[in-house]
A protein has these predicted regions:
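Interdomain "pre-motor" coupling segment immediately N-terminal to P-loop NTPase/helicase cores
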Residues: 3, 7, 11-64
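Walker A/P-loop nucleotide-binding motif
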Residues: 97-113
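Conserved catalytic network of the ASCE P-loop NTPase/AAA+ motor domain
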Residues: 92-95, 120-123, 154-157, 162
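Pre-Walker A (pre-P-loop) alpha-helix and adjacent loop at the N terminus of AAA/AAA+ ATPase modules
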Residues: 65-100
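Conserved post-Walker A coupling segment in P-loop NTPases
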Residues: 97-100, 117-120, 124-140
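Conserved nucleotide-sensing/catalytic segment adjacent to the nucleotide-binding pocket
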Residues: 147-179
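Short glycine-rich substrate-engagement loop in P-loop NTPases that contacts/grips substrate
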Residues: 77-86, 128-157
Length: 179
């Protein structure tokens, strides 16, 4: 009956974990408040994890991205230091609506760092979109005629962080630039 009530209130994560929560409450002789707190915390944790996975999927990152914790700035040829990477990981630039531009020749780790920051942002609750410039131009050109492109453009516009890769490699017309 408890599971059905939790599902009625769309507390799906808590409903799924209810047997474990009840067993833990019995073993620890939890009060009603402690049990209710555990149920609600379980639901919040489940929703946050689901949101994180959904945001990761919607970001369209390239394969094999790594979290920033796995980065050793010395293995990158970008010249970024540990101190700079630490400041960027705090995401205060994102809270202040700032922009970052990583520029340089291929092979420096610009995409890897940008995607690592994007992953950090998703784990901190932000929405992120990753697109290569060539694909972004296609999306802009076809957004009015193709449903999928229009949907993707809408997601890009709503994202709190947009990562555009390979900007300098793709020529764009004035009309495309002003969309």
């Amino acid at each position: 009956r408890l599971t059905a009530l939790l599902e009625t209130f769309t507390l799906k994560h808590a409903a799924r974990m209810l047997p474990d929560l009840l067993e833990t409450a019995d073993l620890q002789d939890s009060s009603c408040r402690e049990f209710l707190l555990a149920v609600l915390e379980t639901e919040v944790k489940g929703r946050n994890e689901r949101r994180r996975k959904r945001n990761y999927s919607a970001a369209h990152f390239p394969p094999n991205i790594r979290p920033l914790e796995e980065f050793d700035p010395e293995e990158l040829e970008s010249g970024i230091t540990h101190a700079q990477l630490s400041v960027l990981k705090e995401l205060s630039w994102l809270d202040n609506c700032g922009n970052l531009v990583f520029a340089g020749p291929p092979g420096l780790g610009k995409t890897m760092v940008a995607c690592g920051l994007g992953l950090q942002a998703i784990n901190s609750g932000y929405t992120v979109c990753f697109e290569k410039m060539t694909n972004l131009i296609k999306i802009l050109d076809t957004a009015e005629t193709e449903r999928a492109a229009g949907f993707r453009l809408k997601n890009i516009k709503k994202a709190q962080l947009v990562i555009i890769d390979e900007i300098g490699y793709t020529p764009i017309s004035r009309e495309q630039a002003n969309r």
